[in-house]
Amino acid sequence: GIGHLLRRRVQLLSGGERQRVAIARALLMTPDLILMDEPLAALDWNRKQEILPWLERLRDELSVPMLYVTHSADEMARLADQVICFENGRIVAEGPLEEVLLERWPGQGEQGSSVVLSGVVTERSEMWCTAVVTAGETAFEVPDAGRNVGEAARLRILARDVSVALSEPRDTSIRNVLPAVVIGMRGVEGESHVMLTLEAGGCRILSRITRRSADELGIAVGTRLYAQVKAAAII
């Protein structure tokens, strides 16, 4: 809440605190729709992390529709359920968040291609400061973000953080090694990388590998392999 801010002068509030107060003032008007146009654009990373959890609570606890305008893939991944992407004034993609990201959201480019998976926290380890998030039939070990067991959680996995192997890796530091099958493969002649769409335990993830690796491993649609998720994070 903002109760502890009520007696503070506006000049003494941080950027994140000012945004929270502005949102609270808007909510006091009992709106039928909340429109936020780049609300975090002027904030640094730390201030964004201060206010994003608050926006998530608004999304989850209020019955008021929220229309959120942003150029940030991270903000979209954390807050959106349905996405409409514009480019030069035209709609170029729309639909559920997971589908739009999977089909290559125009704003993220190949380097930033990613998927968002919705799951539930099923384990937490105080010893290792990790948590297990189960999405579909797949369990992902990730850094603990403070969510309680049973809480819903979203995972974002970048394509560049997923490598593949034809045989099950042994003695590896990578904690998330998933049996998978290639269900899609795309690339452009003359480019050095290809994008694989993988099905792993009811989840679809992307893997960006070099064209040479794909050729030498004989990877094609239908190839069974192991996806090595080098990094996954609760968002």
Task: Label the model's feature ranges.
Residues 34-38:
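Catalytic Walker B motif of ABC-type/P-loop ATPase nucleotide-binding domains
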Residues 9-13, 17:
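Conserved ABC ATPase signature
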Residues 139-186, 204, 208-235:
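Glycine/charge-rich catalytic "coupling/switch" loops of P-loop NTPases
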